[in-house]
């Protein structure tokens, strides 16, 4: 589970430095909930060793993992997934993640990460709380649902007004009033909160 740095002096191994980057306690919970929100495939790509990557992947429950990858490898992976017709979200915080973030459909960077990653990303979130990823997906799902329902209502309502007008059941002035009233109603509904609560999460 450790990344190893080897130090040599005069061509001879003098020390091995073991580095452990603790796993975020909410990581497994976040990945599980992203699946519940509709994310079908979650992949981890890291420059760490195979042993370290395998250990982390098994703990958090990703679908696939790739170890010892270079920045161009990450970018090429994103390109290949897009060629398969998939929408790709890339999350990263380092310079090495920047090419892949740039190639993705939606790039998400950590606010405490490299400046270049933040500049080219579409969204920046705080690294203090990975639960923000769940909130983003929930907002996306709710927004798309609201847009879909609003569009269907507007089309259906206006079509009904047209048919009633053609049939002579509704006067033009009444039809115009109802049309404007429905527009105001849809606008007011669009201003309501998409999520009731985004602050409470239970993970172990």
Language model regions located:
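ABC-family ATPase nucleotide-binding domain "signature/switch" substructure
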Residues: 109
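Cytosolic catalytic headpiece
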Residues: 1-96, 102-106, 138-141, 200-204
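Membrane-embedded alpha-helical bundles of multi-pass transporters
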Residues: 38-39, 60, 64, 96-97, ...
């Amino acid at each position: 589970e450790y990344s190893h740095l080897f130090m040599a002096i005069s061509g001879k191994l003098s020390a091995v430095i073991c580095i452990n980057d603790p796993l975020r306690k909410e990581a497994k919970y976040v990945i599980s909930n992203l699946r519940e929100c509709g994310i079908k495939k979650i992949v981890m790509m890291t420059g760490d060793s195979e042993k370290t990557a395998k250990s982390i992947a098994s703990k958090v429950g990703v679908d696939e993992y790739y170890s010892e990858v270079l920045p161009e490898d990450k970018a090429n992976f994103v390109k290949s997934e897009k060629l398969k017709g998939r929408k790709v979200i890339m999350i990263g915080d380092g310079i090495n993640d920047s090419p892949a973030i740039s190639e993705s459909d939606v790039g998400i960077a950590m606010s405490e990460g490299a400046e270049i990653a933040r500049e080219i990303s579409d969204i920046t979130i705080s690294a203090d709380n990975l639960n923000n990823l769940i909130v983003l997906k929930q907002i996306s799902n709710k927004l798309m649902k609201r847009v879909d329902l609003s569009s269907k209502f507007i089309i259906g309502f206006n079509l009904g007004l047209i048919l009633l007008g053609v049939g002579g059941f509704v006067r033009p002035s009444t039809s115009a009033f109802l049309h404007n009233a429905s527009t105001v109603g849809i606008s007011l509904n669009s201003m309501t909160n998409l999520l009731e609560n985004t602050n409470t999460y239970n993970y172990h």
